[in-house]
Amino acid sequence: MGPLWFCCLPLALLPLLAAVEETLMDSTTATAELGWMVHPPSGWEEVSGYDENMNTIRTYQVCNVFESSQNNWLRTKYIRRRGAHRIHVEMKFSVRDCSSIPNVPGSCKETFNLYYYESDFDSATKTFPNWMENPWMKVDTIAADESFSQVDLGGRVMKINTEVRSFGPVSKNGFYLAFQDYGGCMSLIAVRVFYRKCPRVIQNGAVFQETLSGAESTSLVAARGTCISNAEEVDVPIKLYCNGDGEWLVPIGRCMCRPGYESVENGTVCRGCPSGTFKASQGDEGCVHCPINSRTTSEGATNCVCRNGYYRADADPVDMPCTTIPSAPQAVISSVNETSLMLEWTPPRDSGGREDLVYNIICKSCGSGRGACTRCGDNVQFAPRQLGLTEPRIYISDLLAHTQYTFEIQAVNGVTDQSPFSPQFASVNITTNQAAPSAVSIMHQVSRTVDSITLSWSQPDQPNGVILDYELQYYEKNLSELNSTAVKSPTNTVTVQNLKAGTIYVFQVRARTVAGYGRYSGKMYFQTMTEAEYQTSVQEKLPLIIGSSAAGLVFLIAVVVIIIVCNRRRGFERADSEYTDKLQHYTSGHSTYRGPPPGLGVRLFVMTPGMKIYIDPFTYEDPNEAVREFAKEIDISCVKIEQVIGAGEFGEVCSGHLKLPGKREIFVAIKTLKSGYTEKQRRDFLSEASIMGQFDHPNVIHLEGVVTKSSPVMIITEFMENGSLDSFLRQNDGQFTVIQLVGMLRGIAAGMKYLADMNYVHRDLAARNILVNSNLVCKVSDFGLSRFLEDDTSDPTYTSALGGKIPIRWTAPEAIQYRKFTSASDVWSYGIVMWEVMSYGERPYWDMTNQDVINAIEQDYRLPPPMDCPNALHQLMLDCWQKDRNHRPKFGQIVNTLDKMIRNPNSLKAMAPLSSGVNLPLLDRTIPDYTSFNTVDEWLDAIKMSQYKESFASAGFTTFDIVSQMTVEDILRVGVTLAGHQKKILNSIQVMRAQMNQIQSVEV
């Protein structure tokens, strides 16, 4: 059973190292008499003897076996315990076999007793402590394993017994030992008193100092270890337990060598990794050699540094070899098909030693081949994608016809971003062929009768050559497309005759070049008039015809009179009576009739062939009639309000859903009229719906309908996900290309052209009143709001002027001074909107007061170009800001100009200089003088980059001298990742540097 128990003992309980014994008293070291106390004197006797090595020692012996009732005591001198809790006593003795003694009485013994007595000082006397078991504490009865006889004595054979006993706990400063004989014949040869402790040891990477054993034989004393040099604890705090026999047991926790150090000398030393090796993590494993293309520069390395020209990606493990960028792709093959292209190539000769090779395609348009190439626009399509291609092929479409392109095929891998060099690439030059035009994007109804419809459409976005003609296909909605009829037109306007009255027709149009027909446009639905509608229209036009004739006659007479007056008063300036005109006049190249139709109040009619004319709802005697005529009434049960997204002049603005019977549910914006309104407020609120309901254009906000028959009164419009243009631009500062910004401006101009063609004057055109949807389509909104602003409004944007509030910063000078609002004054406002867009929502005229703005405009000062604004766009702004309104461009001309810029992106490459060569002086607030600021924080506030204050400060860029030396790498390091923000800060730093040089030259 014993051997089996030993084999099954848990390894954790096996002793780690032999105990250390500290001797408190050893009788064998005495060179003179021991002088121990005996009682009675006739008992124990001190004599000199020899040990097993024949060394002279002092011993005690007793042999009173022939006398009965023996009680012989032997007491040691006072022994100090020196902090020990458990005492061990080793006794060497010999005992005479009682049976070998002739005639010995039965009281003969072969054992003796061991006692101890504790005391804080040496207090024993001849009589104290009493010679009895109490107060003495008995340790054990000691019996001999071997005893000697008369024969042994004759042969001088010594049979010495060695016994060890322990006792504890002891707590006083010292103790005495006593040996009691009660009738034996024995010799106490040697007594050694000692205690045990666990030795100093290095175990599990930690040093454990000497530790005293516990008071009991089963005690475990916990000892806290200290990690060896360059090691750290893992898991739980490291401990060892010292048992009662002075042996270490039960190790808990461990220390392991830190990264950069390995365990040597049986785990007792953590040595730094030699040069050329490294260790990345904590543990017992050894250092390993550096991966390929890497090295270390010192001992104790945790990773190996890549050699020049080699890199390690952020996600690469430290034991991965350093790699490099790939070489260029090879054997590029291109296949052009009209305006599409297939590119194929073979992988690079050298992948850089990596497997994450991908390809990027850089497209550059070189026009006719002369001049610098520019990046392709967003219209070019790449399949499967432009960046991160895993296969060596790509299909590119929607290229411009007759255009030279350069395509760079970049080979990149996981370390390309780490390299300071540009990716290696293979380039190919191609020229596209002639191609059919793209689809027509939008079609408008110009006019209609009972049997005809006149339609107009815009030129395709990509004509790809000269448009020869258009083909219009149409058919009744309730019939199949197989029943369609085609009509050709050399222009973008056509009148379709011989249609059925009151019938809905489906129309599609496509353009043709020498390369053939393009795709048909999307289906558009238009309806002819019913007979009843036609009769009503004729009756309404009769007064207009009469009025037009009369107006024509008056016009001829006026021309004659003017000629006579001019001839008589040549050289004198004629007073301009326009400024006394307080009404909004709608003028065009056709006659105007201002007489009221029967049953209605005064309305303004302007006739332009094929174009709807805006009717002012305030000319109705009953404005509610205008709401009924132009706005669709919606049942409140179809509207679901979800959340409030803002507040307007008349109430809250909410988002929600509209579900009309038979139609899909759509997301809408809902304006509500606050409770407690007056009748005038209700009329003014609904007037905007009466205005919006007359408009139908992709760049004008669309009215879904109104709710007037229940409370609250609502205006429901399409929902624009990105909100107002000014805040949208500020939130996305620097995120769009110039072409994208011009596209936004083109949409706004197209919407304003539509409104101007209808003879509607907006009066409050500003970026805050332009809404943007999820596709970045901009739409004009907020109709008639400025018309109803009261004098007590608190909005600082609007300032009192001549009977109302005017947004000074956006308003033309004649409108400010004389309240003269026309489409020409809207053009001035459009120029300000252009400036807002190109500056990403910056406030026009910055922090100038409204009066300062008025004074500056009167002195012919104009806004300077925003940062990175093309010269062509700033020149168009200046054209819009001509003082003479007759010299400003029409919205149609603006649309054509922007279309040309979009078709020819090279025209947008020339940036406007800070001091333009135009005749008008420019306000200079583009980049402030750094000397006007006390701190870098103030400078960042001034250039509207305050979000980077903490980044500049934490990176140490706290003085202008340091900031002026910043590079692109420094700007990236402080966390400026947006390209627009980088340009703005770099431009400001360049000006700061120039200003510093100028100051230094003046000081010299």
UniProtKB/Swiss-Prot annotation:
The keyword Flavoprotein does not apply. Residues 1-19 form the signal peptide. Pfam families: EphA2_TM, Ephrin_lbd, Ephrin_rec_like, fn3, PK_Tyr_Ser-Thr, SAM_1. The keyword Transmembrane helix applies. SUPFAM superfamilies: Fibronectin type III, Galactose-binding domain-like, Growth factor receptor domain, Protein kinase-like (PK-like), SAM/Pointed domain. Disulfide bonds join C63-C185, C98-C108. Ligand binding induces cleavage by matrix metalloproteinases (MMPs) such as MMP7/MMP9, producing an EphB2/N-terminal fragment (NTF) and a C-terminal long fragment (EphB2-LF). EphB2-LF is further cleaved by MMPs, producing EphB2/CTF1 which is further cleaved by the PS1/gamma-secretase producing EphB2/CTF2. The active site is at D764. Residues 20-544 are extracellular. Its EC number is 2.7.10.1. Glycans are attached at N266, N337, N429, N478, N483. It is a single-pass type I membrane protein. GO terms for biological process: angiogenesis; axon guidance; axonal fasciculation; dendritic spine development; dendritic spine morphogenesis; ephrin receptor signaling pathway; peptidyl-tyrosine phosphorylation; positive regulation of synapse assembly. Residues 566-1004 are cytoplasmic. One of its GO terms (molecular function) is ATP binding. Residues 21-203 form the Eph LBD domain. Wide tissue distribution throughout development and sustained expression in adult brain. The longer form (CEK5+) is specifically expressed in the central nervous system. A motif (PDZ-binding) lies at residues 1002-1004. The chain crosses the membrane at residues 545-565. Residues 931-995 form the SAM domain. Residues 325-435, 436-531 form the Fibronectin type-III domain. Receptor tyrosine kinase which binds promiscuously transmembrane ephrin-B family ligands residing on adjacent cells, leading to contact-dependent bidirectional signaling into neighboring cells. The signaling pathway downstream of the receptor is referred to as forward signaling while the signaling pathway downstream of the ephrin ligand is referred to as reverse signaling. Functions in axon guidance during development. In addition to axon guidance, also regulates dendritic spines development and maturation and stimulates the formation of excitatory synapses. Heterotetramer upon binding of the ligand. The heterotetramer is composed of an ephrin dimer and a receptor dimer. Oligomerization is probably required to induce biological responses. Belongs to the protein kinase superfamily. Tyr protein kinase family. Ephrin receptor subfamily. This is Ephrin type-B receptor 2.
